[in-house]
Amino acid sequence: EISECLVGSEMCIRDRPRGIEGLIADANKHGIKFGIWIEPEMANTTSELYEKHPEWVLKAPNREIVLGRGGTQVVLDLSNPEVQDFIFGIVDNLMTTYPEIDYIKWDANMSILNHGSQYLPSDQQSHMYIEYHEGFKKVCERIRAKYPDLTLQACASGGGRANYGVMPYFDEFWVSDNTDALQRIYMQWGTSYFFPAIAMASHISAAPNHQTFRVIPLKYRIDVAMSGRLGMEIQPKNMTEEEKTLCRKAIADYKTIRPVVQFGDIYRLVSPYDRLGVASLMYTSPEKDKAVFYWWKTEHFVNQHLP
């Protein structure tokens, strides 16, 4: 388990004396590709990075800095080329040291609340947000140029990075921290108007759900997750053998329909927002010779006549 150590400090491992090498070895032993969750745009006011470079964080002049998680989190100023080099170096060092890394979840758990750059001159402060994202883009371009086969997920407390600007550099984005399957039907329905299924990370999560505390049958959670880019957000050690068998079958089935779901055309058949008690959509292959049909019951009505 990678500990929740200070963002901006050296990565630390708790209860893993073999370090990341040991985690990668364990993953390889079980035939699993290894991925890691990082948050390179963030720092903490109590971290080594902040102590060395307090001028690297976003901060409005003559204002007290607004802090995020834990009362210490801050956002690094990506308009600053030195910060760009530092953030690229985080990924580059990881990939150079551990070339077996196949996947990176790039998180950002604080919005830009301090609207000021300590790097930009006063006459460019109004462009801070634009310059931040231009710097972010430069970092992404460097990562993609050097590691074209690395799978990257854009994650920002959920869907904060769901935009066309990051899609050239990331393979998928995290739709929402809310993985409640019933609510995901609504969220993914709306998201599908703007983004294809291949971009929507859609994961099977535990029950009770960690956000809504709702208990939803595993089969229902699987069926909803399979309508996007399928993943698992659940601890195998907490699953029964029956549940593991069901998930193994779901993953195998998804691999057969994946080309249609991720590269096909979408047909919206019944919107969950119509409040008919059901939602339904269908993907078809470009040649229209294959189709995948989804149908979910969303509400219970007396004497309900289903389409």
Report each predicted region and the residues it spans.
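Single conserved hydrophobic/aromatic residue that forms the stacking wall/gate
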Residues: E1-G8, C12-I13
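Conserved, mostly hydrophobic/aromatic
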Residues: A27, I87, D107, L152, ...
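Hydrophobic faces of well-ordered beta-strands that scaffold small-molecule active sites
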Residues: F34-I38, I104-W106, Q153-A154, M232
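Active-site beta-loop-alpha junctions enriched in small/polar residues
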Residues: E39-A43, A108-S111, C155-G159
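Glycan-recognition surfaces
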Residues: L49-D85, I130-N238
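An active-site-proximal structural segment forming one wall of the substrate-binding cleft
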Residues: L76-W106
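Catalytic cores of secreted or luminal carbohydrate-active enzymes
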Residues: K219-S271
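Carbohydrate-binding surface patches
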Residues: P272-P307
